[in-house]
């Protein structure tokens, strides 16, 4: 009975599961996130083994995220023009093909760093569109009343898949190699796409636009310029991405050079990172459509920064993973509130563009990955996280005090 109630959204924190198409979307996201979790671990470890350079690890993460910045505006414009269900299926197939190509290069032992970088960029292009359309389609399916719950549960599925994927990645890399790892990544992406075939409705999406893409892009720029709330949320999300989320690119360095736990340890660390996010998302989902979202958003961002600073004194694996879990609980809360408030502060027909704004914000990550990699290569990984955490904390405190209108958003 408890399981039935959960699947049909009778529990408060699982309210969005009452919608059939949301349950399918959640399952698809879970499967694709399994692949993404494996891919994140594999990419960092592969580049570190090929180059022995923390900077190159950061550069690889930057290559993976660069398309988010350059395609953020375009993805938002496209999201408001297409059937989001159909396009999500197409994107899942594309991700599976790219993972197979990477596996083929590794299995045949011809992979070079430039191959890895090029395919990382290609995968980033796929995910720039996937993230935009998935967030907008989640809102379509559950509607504004359950938007926060739906987005939190969708992020939860990403985290759960990421935990399982990270643990699997460490074991597969250690036993079968990175080539086999990318075959598993491809299978996960393909399975997620197949689940989407069962999704039926368009939800509460506005009528699909038929104006030229260029005109949609121009309208998007005008939206950002005219909607100050959206612009501020974009900038806050970008700052959190550059100085906060980029900590994950240093996990391979901590695993191998600071904590000496190897590929299996890296998998565990990545799983704990995702697990912390799960705790934060469960808390957020259980709160329902609460007021004072802006205050909670700022508090989570500040906690994120303070947690990163603690990494500089984490000298053993147990302290490290505990802090890692708490940091990512805060990170997941802040990120989900950014997405929710962006969509709640634009008209229905522009929510695709709003999520394109979020993708554009997280597309600033390459600057952060390159920067944190350079600092880590010069001063060490702990110092790099101390600096980034201090900057993020400062931004969170000053903007919370200086932007009362954003702080009062609900």
Which role fits each region the language model picked out?
Residues 22, 84, 135, 146-148, ...:
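Cytoplasm-facing, short amphipathic helices at loop-to-helix transitions on the intracellular side
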Residues 25, 111-119, 233, 318-324:
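Short hydrophobic/alpha-helical segments at membrane-entry points of transmembrane helices
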Residues 32, 64, 154-158, 273, ...:
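Structural signature of transmembrane alpha-helices in multi-pass secondary transporters
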């Amino acid at each position: 009975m408890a399981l039935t109630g959960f699947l049909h959204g009778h529990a408060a924190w699982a309210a969005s599961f009452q919608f059939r198409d949301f349950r399918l979307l959640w399952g698809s996201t879970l499967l694709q996130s399994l692949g993404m979790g494996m891919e994140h671990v594999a990419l960092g470890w592969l580049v570190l083994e090929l180059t022995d350079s923390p900077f190159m690890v950061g550069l690889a993460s930057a290559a993976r995220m660069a398309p988010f910045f350059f395609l953020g505006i375009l993805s938002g414009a496209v999201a408001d023009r297409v059937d989001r269900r159909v396009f999500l299926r197409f994107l899942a197939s594309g991700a599976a093909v790219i993972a197979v190509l990477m596996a083929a290069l590794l299995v045949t032992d011809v992979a070079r760093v430039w191959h890895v970088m090029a395919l990382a960029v290609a995968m980033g292009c796929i995910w720039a569109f996937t993230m935009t359309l998935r967030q907008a389609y989640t809102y379509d399916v559950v509607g504004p009343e359950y938007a926060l719950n739906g987005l939190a549960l969708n992020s939860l599925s990403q985290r759960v898949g990421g935990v399982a994927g990270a643990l699997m990645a460490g074991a597969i890399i250690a036993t079968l190699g990175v080539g086999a790892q990318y075959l598993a990544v491809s299978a996960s992406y393909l399975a997620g796409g197949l689940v989407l075939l069962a999704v039926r409705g368009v939800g509460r999406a506005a009528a699909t636009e038929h104006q030229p893409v260029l005109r949609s892009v121009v309208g998007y720029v005008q939206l950002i310029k005219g909607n100050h709330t959206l612009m501020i949320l974009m900038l806050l999300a970008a700052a959190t991405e550059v100085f906060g989320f980029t900590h994950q690119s240093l996990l391979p360095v901590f695993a191998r050079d600071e904590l000496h736990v190897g590929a299996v340890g890296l998998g565990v660390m990545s799983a704990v990172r995702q697990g912390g996010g799960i705790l934060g998302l469960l808390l957020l989902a259980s709160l329902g459509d609460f007021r004072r979202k802006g205050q909670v958003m700022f508090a989570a961002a500040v906690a994120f920064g303070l947690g990163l600073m603690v990494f500089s004194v984490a000298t053993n694996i147990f302290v490290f993973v505990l802090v890692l879990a708490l940091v990512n609980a805060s990170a997941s809360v802040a990120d989900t509130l950014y997405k929710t408030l962006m969509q709640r502060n634009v008209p229905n027909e522009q929510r695709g563009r709003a999520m394109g704004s979020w993708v554009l914000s997280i597309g600033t990550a390459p600057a952060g990955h390159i920067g944190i990699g350079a600092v880590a290569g010069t001063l060490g990984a702990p110092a790099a996280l101390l600096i980034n955490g201090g900057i993020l904390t400062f931004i969170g405190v000053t903007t919370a005090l200086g932007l009362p209108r954003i702080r009062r958003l609900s």
